[in-house]
Amino acid sequence: EGLDFVHNLLGGRCSRMVADSSEGDVVAFLAWKGRLDEMQDLAEECCDRLAAAGLDGWLILGQNLATTADVRRGYLTMCACQADALRIWPGRRWFSLEQMAFTAACREILEKGEAETQQRLAVLPWLREGTETDLFGTLCVYYLDAGSSLSKTAEQLYVHKNTVKYRIQQVEQRLGYRVDQQPEAIELYTACALVRLLGETTLGQSDNALPDTSDFTP
């Protein structure tokens, strides 16, 4: 059923397509020359039609896979990381292979043990100490749920956009750099993802302790 769905939806959207099913997944290779925004719109449309048809599933989009080894590596990463990706970006309906690779890298950090994990989360106390404001939780939503958009973050947190802007400014004041500054933002983004993988749901708690990773089994 899923394979027929993909053929019907994508068959007329590209010059060539090869699709088949493997272990419950549908894999499609497209000769696609459209723009990035067109591909993203197509992904959203595919998700909408999946939901309308009563089919469960997520999309993984990958480009620039030059060899069969690249395809195999990407597919195995996708299979291994789907559950973790949904914990990092809950509610998301489609992912890129780059997001799946990032998810795999986060899992590798956790598997290295408590010391490595705590080092990657060392930023947390600086955002929690001396405040009851949910600075780190706001940052998680800003990065992982709202695509670094102040207005979308405000919508998700049910607060005014200026409130989010103030909180982000407080984060930057405490850390000494802008949250969109590279490479610093990479560490912040990773810390947000790790906290979600560790299952800490109360991100706004004002204590200055790091998440307890001593009993965590990857």
Functional labels for PLM-detected ranges:
Residues 1-218:
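Cytosolic nucleotide-utilizing catalytic cores of signal-transduction proteins
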